[in-house]
Each structure stands twice: as C-alpha cells, then as structure tokens.
Amino acid sequence: MAKRSTTRRRPGRKPAFRRPAVQAAVAGLRYIESSALLAALLEHDASVLAALQADGRYVTSSLTFAEAARAIIRARVAGRLAVAMEQGAVRGLRTFERRCFIVDVTSAVLARAGRPFPVEPVRTLDAVHLATAELLAEPPQLVTIVTRDARVRDNARALGYSVE
C-alpha cells in the first residue's frame, strides 16, 4: 500500500479531516473502530490483522487514538501487559495513525451521536464512532466497519454498512 502524505493543520483552521479528503475515496473505505484496533494491538486478533492488511482506504475517528492509548496504559497498570508489549502496542498504534485518514470529532459528529440509533442502547463513545462513519459522505454500501463491539456491529448493520 502506498504511503499517504500527511498534511498539517494551519493555525486557525479546523478541518473535519486531517488527512487527504475522505470524500475522494470511492470504494474500499474501511472504518476501523477502536475495539478492533485494540484487538489487533493487544490480542493479535488474526481476523482484525487481516482486515488491517486488506486493500482499501482506512479511516477512523481521532477518538480512536485516545481510547487505544488509554486502554494500553490500563492494561500495563493492571499487569496484563509487560513493558515490552506496551511499547510494541504503542508502535503499532503510531504506525496505524500514519496509514489512515483521521476524522476529527466535530460538532456535527457530536450532534449526530446525540440522536437515536436503530439499535439502542448505544454508549456515547460507540455513538461517536457510528456518527463519524455516517458523516463520511459515502454510501454505506461502500464502507466496511471493522469492529469487535456488538453494539457498534448491530447498529452498523442496521444502518446498511458491511461489518468485519
């Protein structure tokens, strides 16, 4: 997969997308939700690792990186992760960050997250991920949601997305 160039924010500008416009992606868009990324980083989940190596453009919410970083720290503090494994997980997280489009949590994302979803109840952070996927300006048929979370999976399917 070709390396994507990164673009930096200009002072005073707050674009919804921090990398090249996601709207330009026509097919093969894969929204990576935090539970799936953590399954790859901490559990080496084979199906998620395969999904992360599949063809397509990867996109995630900026929320994913905060969630993943906190989960890695919690795992180390709880004694479930050795220091070397923590370092490997952090490296993997940074590698993923360089490979994907990152969508900021905007007021539009938060407004959508605050409205009902087809399958309730939905936790707030899950609603933010679902709202982010919905606001990508792509038809659901062109987006695959990669997740390990049952609530996200059920809602993604109800919204017309394919799920891995």
What are these regions, as identified by a protein language model?
Residues A2-E67, A75-G88:
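Short, well-structured N-terminal submotif of metal-dependent ribonuclease cores
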Residues A50, Y58-T60, I73-V77, V83-V103, ...:
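Anionic, Ser/Thr-rich low-complexity intrinsically disordered regions
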Residues I32, S162-E164:
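Short hydrophobic/aromatic-enriched beta-strand-loop microsegments
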